[in-house]
Design a protein with these regions (language model features):
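Short glycine-rich anion-binding loops that position phosphate/pyrophosphate groups of nucleotides
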Residues: 11, 78-81, 109-111
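Short, well-ordered alpha-helix to beta-strand connector turns
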Residues: 31, 70-71, 121-122
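General small-molecule cofactor/ligand-binding pocket signal
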Residues: 6, 34-36
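Structured adenosyl-cofactor binding patch, chiefly the S-adenosyl-L-methionine
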Residues: 115-159
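N-terminal beta1-alpha1 ligand-phosphate binding loop
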Residues: 1-27
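S-adenosyl-L-methionine/SAH cofactor-binding core of RNA-modifying enzymes
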Residues: 39-101
Length: 159
Protein backbone atom coordinates (compact mmCIF):
# COMPACT_ATOMS: atom_id res chain seq x y z
CA UNK A 1 0.00 0.00 0.00
CA UNK A 2 1.15 3.52 -0.73
CA UNK A 3 0.09 6.54 1.28
CA UNK A 4 0.11 10.03 -0.17
CA UNK A 5 -0.55 13.26 1.69
CA UNK A 6 -1.56 16.30 -0.34
CA UNK A 7 -1.25 19.46 1.71
CA UNK A 8 -1.64 23.17 1.22
CA UNK A 9 1.23 25.32 2.46
CA UNK A 10 4.96 24.99 2.85
CA UNK A 11 6.46 23.94 6.17
CA UNK A 12 8.69 26.77 7.40
CA UNK A 13 9.43 25.75 10.99
CA UNK A 14 12.51 23.53 11.42
CA UNK A 15 11.05 21.61 14.36
CA UNK A 16 8.11 20.54 12.17
CA UNK A 17 10.38 19.65 9.24
CA UNK A 18 12.51 17.49 11.54
CA UNK A 19 9.49 15.76 13.08
CA UNK A 20 7.92 15.13 9.68
CA UNK A 21 11.17 13.69 8.34
CA UNK A 22 11.51 11.45 11.40
CA UNK A 23 8.06 9.92 10.91
CA UNK A 24 8.50 9.56 7.14
CA UNK A 25 11.62 7.50 7.93
CA UNK A 26 9.80 5.44 10.56
CA UNK A 27 6.89 4.67 8.23
CA UNK A 28 9.05 3.51 5.27
CA UNK A 29 9.45 -0.12 6.49
CA UNK A 30 5.64 -0.43 6.51
CA UNK A 31 4.50 1.55 3.48
CA UNK A 32 5.61 3.82 0.69
CA UNK A 33 4.69 7.35 1.67
CA UNK A 34 5.00 10.77 0.11
CA UNK A 35 3.93 14.31 0.91
CA UNK A 36 3.15 16.71 -1.90
CA UNK A 37 2.90 20.38 -0.98
CA UNK A 38 0.88 22.98 -2.85
CA UNK A 39 1.34 26.73 -2.26
CA UNK A 40 -1.10 28.72 -0.16
CA UNK A 41 -3.38 31.04 -2.11
CA UNK A 42 -2.57 34.69 -1.38
CA UNK A 43 -4.92 36.30 1.11
CA UNK A 44 -4.98 39.73 2.71
CA UNK A 45 -5.28 40.35 6.44
CA UNK A 46 -8.82 40.08 7.83
CA UNK A 47 -10.42 38.61 4.70
CA UNK A 48 -14.19 38.70 4.22
CA UNK A 49 -16.21 35.48 4.09
CA UNK A 50 -16.36 35.68 0.30
CA UNK A 51 -12.58 36.15 0.13
CA UNK A 52 -12.11 33.11 2.38
CA UNK A 53 -14.36 31.05 0.09
CA UNK A 54 -12.32 32.21 -2.90
CA UNK A 55 -9.08 31.14 -1.18
CA UNK A 56 -10.56 27.72 -0.36
CA UNK A 57 -11.74 27.38 -3.96
CA UNK A 58 -8.31 28.29 -5.40
CA UNK A 59 -6.47 25.95 -3.05
CA UNK A 60 -9.06 23.22 -3.59
CA UNK A 61 -8.62 23.35 -7.37
CA UNK A 62 -4.88 22.71 -6.97
CA UNK A 63 -5.54 19.55 -4.98
CA UNK A 64 -8.57 18.49 -7.02
CA UNK A 65 -6.68 18.72 -10.32
CA UNK A 66 -3.92 16.49 -8.95
CA UNK A 67 -6.32 13.67 -8.04
CA UNK A 68 -7.12 10.80 -10.37
CA UNK A 69 -10.62 9.34 -10.68
CA UNK A 70 -9.67 6.08 -8.96
CA UNK A 71 -7.80 7.68 -6.03
CA UNK A 72 -9.23 6.80 -2.62
CA UNK A 73 -9.33 10.19 -0.93
CA UNK A 74 -9.65 10.86 2.80
CA UNK A 75 -10.10 14.48 3.80
CA UNK A 76 -9.15 15.78 7.22
CA UNK A 77 -12.04 17.82 8.54
CA UNK A 78 -12.45 19.16 12.05
CA UNK A 79 -16.20 18.45 11.98
CA UNK A 80 -16.07 14.79 10.92
CA UNK A 81 -15.77 11.55 12.86
CA UNK A 82 -12.95 11.21 15.35
CA UNK A 83 -11.08 7.94 15.69
CA UNK A 84 -8.85 6.90 18.55
CA UNK A 85 -5.47 5.40 17.63
CA UNK A 86 -6.70 1.78 17.62
CA UNK A 87 -9.72 2.71 15.48
CA UNK A 88 -7.48 4.67 13.12
CA UNK A 89 -5.14 1.69 12.78
CA UNK A 90 -8.08 -0.58 11.92
CA UNK A 91 -9.46 2.05 9.53
CA UNK A 92 -6.18 2.24 7.58
CA UNK A 93 -5.61 -1.51 7.59
CA UNK A 94 -9.18 -2.15 6.41
CA UNK A 95 -8.40 -0.02 3.36
CA UNK A 96 -5.30 -2.12 2.74
CA UNK A 97 -7.22 -5.40 3.10
CA UNK A 98 -9.84 -4.14 0.63
CA UNK A 99 -7.07 -3.88 -1.94
CA UNK A 100 -6.51 -0.14 -1.96
CA UNK A 101 -3.07 0.31 -3.47
CA UNK A 102 -3.07 4.05 -2.74
CA UNK A 103 -4.71 6.10 -0.02
CA UNK A 104 -4.57 9.88 -0.39
CA UNK A 105 -5.07 12.14 2.62
CA UNK A 106 -5.84 15.78 1.89
CA UNK A 107 -5.04 18.62 4.27
CA UNK A 108 -6.47 22.03 3.46
CA UNK A 109 -4.98 25.42 4.14
CA UNK A 110 -5.67 27.79 7.01
CA UNK A 111 -9.34 28.13 6.07
CA UNK A 112 -10.03 24.46 5.40
CA UNK A 113 -11.18 22.59 2.31
CA UNK A 114 -13.38 23.72 -0.56
CA UNK A 115 -16.85 22.22 -0.89
CA UNK A 116 -15.82 20.65 -4.21
CA UNK A 117 -12.92 18.85 -2.52
CA UNK A 118 -15.08 17.72 0.40
CA UNK A 119 -17.53 16.19 -2.08
CA UNK A 120 -14.70 14.45 -3.95
CA UNK A 121 -13.40 12.76 -0.79
CA UNK A 122 -14.41 9.14 -0.36
CA UNK A 123 -14.32 9.60 3.39
CA UNK A 124 -13.56 12.30 5.95
CA UNK A 125 -12.10 12.01 9.42
CA UNK A 126 -11.02 14.35 12.19
CA UNK A 127 -7.73 13.98 14.03
CA UNK A 128 -9.14 15.98 16.94
CA UNK A 129 -11.80 18.51 17.82
CA UNK A 130 -8.93 20.82 18.72
CA UNK A 131 -7.68 23.29 16.13
CA UNK A 132 -4.04 22.95 15.05
CA UNK A 133 -1.82 24.90 12.69
CA UNK A 134 -2.45 23.23 9.35
CA UNK A 135 1.33 22.65 9.05
CA UNK A 136 1.28 20.79 12.38
CA UNK A 137 -1.52 18.56 11.12
CA UNK A 138 0.96 16.81 8.82
CA UNK A 139 3.15 15.81 11.74
CA UNK A 140 0.18 14.62 13.79
CA UNK A 141 -1.18 12.60 10.85
CA UNK A 142 2.21 10.99 10.20
CA UNK A 143 2.60 10.07 13.86
CA UNK A 144 -0.84 8.44 13.85
CA UNK A 145 -0.08 6.53 10.63
CA UNK A 146 3.14 5.23 12.20
CA UNK A 147 1.35 4.38 15.44
CA UNK A 148 -1.35 2.64 13.39
CA UNK A 149 1.18 0.34 11.75
CA UNK A 150 2.78 -0.44 15.13
CA UNK A 151 -0.64 -1.29 16.59
CA UNK A 152 -1.55 -3.46 13.60
CA UNK A 153 1.77 -5.36 13.78
CA UNK A 154 1.46 -5.62 17.58
CA UNK A 155 4.89 -4.01 17.93
CA UNK A 156 6.11 -1.88 20.81
CA UNK A 157 6.07 1.83 20.10
CA UNK A 158 9.07 3.58 21.61
CA UNK A 159 7.91 7.16 21.93
Amino acid sequence: MKIRILAIGKIKENYLKEGIQEYLTRIKPYSQIEIIEFPDAPVKDNPSLSEIEKVKELEGKKLFNFLKNDDYVISLDLNKKELDSVEFSKYIMDKMVLGRSLITFIIGGSYGLSDELKKRANDSISLSKMTFLHQMTRLILLEQIYRGFKIYKNETYHK
